[in-house]
């Protein structure tokens, strides 16, 4: 059966509008996808959604909501006391803290204050993010069933804890198509030199969708995409002739076999040819004015840093790339949380603010949805031996924070 010809609930993919959203809506992709589908459905809604593209700043490891966005003054007062049995009962705990004889509560050692007209509570660790409080919707009631990193990250990227499903960027590419035929619909950037749970390519893969919808990972070296540049002595015209010949051969084979993978291969060859001209224009930041680096920081000049990737995300958004996925590892603080989370915030706070501010000043924030968050949160009790100034927090799937900005989102 040709699955592309199936419609309605009888499709093995369930690709009616309703079934599609129901099946994929488990992860954050459901929010982004529903928003964008409404924007292009042409149904004459009274308040049509605005988002045309998504920038997802994924913080891998599970940032501590208690120390960043979810202000808990009562918890601070109760620091050192035992987690009540009434709360602990029935809670799923990891093997790292589930066998502890004691689970002492520990509040945040960091100060919180309210910001903007919206009065949103934000930690002192995020002074720059606090400047965009009135552009953000902070959701402190996020919930997941996953308690370990692999299933948790997979769920947030695909809507399923099991591997093999299409990622949200792949779904958007498949469902909405391209806004710029000279660039991929879906681009992934990973902060270099970070440690933590491995980030595998299936997180930006296409699953059972055609391979052309998978994310294209940009490298942090001078060649953003491996093997894209033409070899010395090969002209653009000769490369065009070779591709035309390959295209004809693939068409003959496609007619004989009906193998849809051949269509994907043809599309990828054509995209690669076009990107030989379009990619240098996107990745070359040499013409960015001084004001850009005053905003993002000097770290934005260093390829592969979170700041550089945020700047790259803005440039890709300007070129109408549909889905731009950033990954930043290092949030898994089972120990030494006070020191570790400070380092993470120093790396990400300024650039996250700069990206939202930059999109806004360029008129791009209204139709770009920015998402910041991880796969789960952290516990309100101490992992390991209690020390109020040097402690860790275990994984906590039942409560974590994510913020959204742009695309019509309001505080």
Regions found by a protein language model. Give the residues of each.
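Ligand-binding pockets and gating/stacking loops
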Residues: 2-411
């Amino acid at each position: 059966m040709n699955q592309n010809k199936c419609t309605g609930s009888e499709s093995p993919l369930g690709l009616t509008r309703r079934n599609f959203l129901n099946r994929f809506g488990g992860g954050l992709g459901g929010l982004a996808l529903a928003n964008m589908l409404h924007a292009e459905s042409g149904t004459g809604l009274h308040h049509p959604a605005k988002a045309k593209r998504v920038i997802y700043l994924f913080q891998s490891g599970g940032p501590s909501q208690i120390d960043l966005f979810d202000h808990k003054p009562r918890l601070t007062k109760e620091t050192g006391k035992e987690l009540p049995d009434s709360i602990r009962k029935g809670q799923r705990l990891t093997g790292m803290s589930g066998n502890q004889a004691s689970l002492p509560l520990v509040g945040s050692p960091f100060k919180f204050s309210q910001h903007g007209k919206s009065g949103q509570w934000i930690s002192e660790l995020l002074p720059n993010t606090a400047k965009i409080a009135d552009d953000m919707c902070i959701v402190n009631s996020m919930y997941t069933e996953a308690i370990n990193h692999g299933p948790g990250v997979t769920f947030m990227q695909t809507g399923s804890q099991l591997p093999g499903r299409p990622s949200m960027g792949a779904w958007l590419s498949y469902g909405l198509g391209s806004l710029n035929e000279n660039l991929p619909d879906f681009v992934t950037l990973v902060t270099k030199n970070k440690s933590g749970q491995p980030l595998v390519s299936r997180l930006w893969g296409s699953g059972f969708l055609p391979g052309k919808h998978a994310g294209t990972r940009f490298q942090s070296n001078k060649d953003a995409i491996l093997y894209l540049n033409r070899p010395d002595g090969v002209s653009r015209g000769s490369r065009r002739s070779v591709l035309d010949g390959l295209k004809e051969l693939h068409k003959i084979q496609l007619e004989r076999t009906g193998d849809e993978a051949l269509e994907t291969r043809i599309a990828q060859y054509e995209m690669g040819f076009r990107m030989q001209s379009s990619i240098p224009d996107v990745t070359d930041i040499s013409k960015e004015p001084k004001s850009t680096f005053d905003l993002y920081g000097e770290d934005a000049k260093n390829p592969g840093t979170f700041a550089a990737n945020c700047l790259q995300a803005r440039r890709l958004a300007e070129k109408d790339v549909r889905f731009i996925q950033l990954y930043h590892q290092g949030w898994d603080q089972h120990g030494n949380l006070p020191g570790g989370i400070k380092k993470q915030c120093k790396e990400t706070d300024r650039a996250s603010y700069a990206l939202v501010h930059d999109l806004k000043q360029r008129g791009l924030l209204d139709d770009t949805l920015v998402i910041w968050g991880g796969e789960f949160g952290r516990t309100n009790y101490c992992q390991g031996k209690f020390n109020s100034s040097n402690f860790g927090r275990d994984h906590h799937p039942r409560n974590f924070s994510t913020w959204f900005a742009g695309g019509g989102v309001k505080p």
